């Protein structure tokens, strides 16, 4: 491990042939001989879109690119594809040239002959179209319209820009149509007026007068007896019904008072009478179930806990249990719970008596 100063600088054995490499300090650099790209400075003009387009449009035909590392050095590069707008402009120019050439050729085509030659050709065409077949006689009136038709056709064929001229036949047809339309329309209008005015008036007058009178008479005749009969029926029906209702209303409060008195008497005696057809929920009273209170019974044939303790602690428990088992099938009713209980003061008095007797005997 030594410093950089101790190492001797190695020089290449062969001299460098490239004159660009001799300027570079380090010949081992892979980019030796390629000029460095300039660094952009703040004051330098930046590339705007216009300058970029100009650079794209300017495509050199034979670009001079020299790169010693390139495998295709000395081979000319393929030209870049031109932009779209340039291609469209070229297409438009080519199409315009083609269409202009076609227009010029079509305009000069049909009008090949000019002057007296064109007039002679027109006459020959007219004669060939209007010439009648052999052995037939043709009137002068029939020839004239055919000649006019042929002339108009030739004019249209020779000069396509000329407007169509109305033929006399078309004019005649138009005049006939005008003449036909006017009298027919007038006659139809007059017929309609004649039909509408007298018929409508007569029909309305005839329909309105007798029918309206008959209807009014019928209504007057129908209204009078029907109204009278209805009024009589109402008067007859109202009188008995009103009497019946009054009597019922008088009877109802008496019955209600009697029922109230009877219910009060039943409540006083304590007898609860249930109304038929009415549930307690419909009357608004809750149906509360009253469970019967069960009598508290001891676990073993009515013996109290104190009695159980006394019997268990006594010496002759077995005999008592046996006697209880034997006597259990007898028909005597079991004593109630309260009767079996031995009260505390009675028990103490019995013990005092025994102690007193024991003391007397000892003395």
From Swiss-Prot:
Which stretches does the entry tag as region Disordered?
A: 1-81, 126-152, 191-210, 231-363
- Subcellular location(s) per record: Cytoplasm, Cytosol
**Taking the first listed entry, what is the main subcellular location of this protein, grouped into a coarse class?**
cytoplasm
Q: Name one GO cellular component term.
A: cytosol
Compositionally biased region (Polar residues): 1-12, 259-285, 311-321
Q: Can you tell which superkingdom this protein's organism belongs to?
A: Eukaryota
Q: Mind telling me how this protein is modified after translation? A: Phosphorylated.
Q: What are the protein's UniProt keywords?
A: Cell cycle, Cell division, Cytoplasm, Mitosis, Phosphoprotein, Ubl conjugation, Ubl conjugation pathway
Q: Low complexity bias located where?
A: 296-308
Name recorded for this polypeptide: Cell division cycle-associated protein 3
Q: Specify the species.
A: Xenopus laevis
Which lineage ranks, top first, belong to the organism behind this chain? Eukaryota, Metazoa, Chordata, Craniata, Vertebrata
């Amino acid at each position: 491990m030594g410093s950089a100063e101790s190492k001797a600088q190695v020089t290449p054995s062969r001299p460098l042939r490239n004159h660009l490499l001799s300027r570079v300090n380090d010949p081992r650099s892979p980019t030796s001989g390629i000029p460095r790209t300039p660094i952009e400075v703040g004051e330098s003009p930046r590339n705007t879109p216009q300058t970029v387009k100009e650079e794209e449009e300017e495509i050199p035909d034979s670009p001079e690119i020299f790169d010693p590392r390139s495998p295709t050095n000395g081979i000319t590069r393929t030209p870049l594809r031109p932009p779209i707008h340039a291609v469209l402009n070229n297409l438009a120019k080519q199409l315009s040239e083609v269409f202009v050439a076609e227009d010029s050729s079509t305009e000069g085509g049909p009008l090949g002959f000019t002057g007296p030659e064109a007039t002679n050709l027109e006459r020959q065409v007219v004669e060939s179209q209007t010439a009648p077949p052999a052995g037939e006689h043709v009137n002068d009136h029939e020839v004239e319209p055919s000649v006019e038709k042929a002339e108009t056709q030739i004019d249209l064929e020779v000069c396509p820009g000329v407007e169509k001229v109305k033929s006399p036949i078309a004019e005649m047809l138009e005049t006939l149509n005008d003449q036909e339309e006017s009298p027919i329309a007038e006659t139809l209008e007059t017929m309609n007026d004649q039909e509408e005015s007298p018929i409508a008036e007569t029909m309305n007058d005839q329909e309105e007068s007798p029918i309206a009178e008959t209807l009014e008479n019928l209504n007057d005749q129908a209204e009078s007896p029907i109204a009278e009969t209805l009024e009589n029926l109402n008067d007859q029906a109202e009188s008995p019904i009103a009497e019946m209702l009054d009597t019922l209303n008088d009877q109802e409060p008496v019955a209600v008072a009697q029922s109230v008195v009877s219910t009060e008497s039943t409540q006083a005696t304590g007898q609860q009478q249930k109304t038929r057809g009415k549930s307690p929920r419909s009357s608004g009273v809750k149906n509360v179930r009253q469970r019967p209170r069960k009598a508290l019974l001891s676990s073993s044939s009515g013996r109290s806990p104190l009695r159980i303790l006394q019997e268990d602690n006594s010496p002759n428990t077995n005999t008592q249990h046996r006697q209880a088992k034997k006597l259990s099938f007898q028909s005597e009713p079991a004593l109630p719970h309260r009767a079996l209980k031995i009260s505390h003061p009675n028990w103490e008095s019995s013990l005092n008596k025994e102690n007193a007797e024991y003391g007397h005997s000892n003395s």
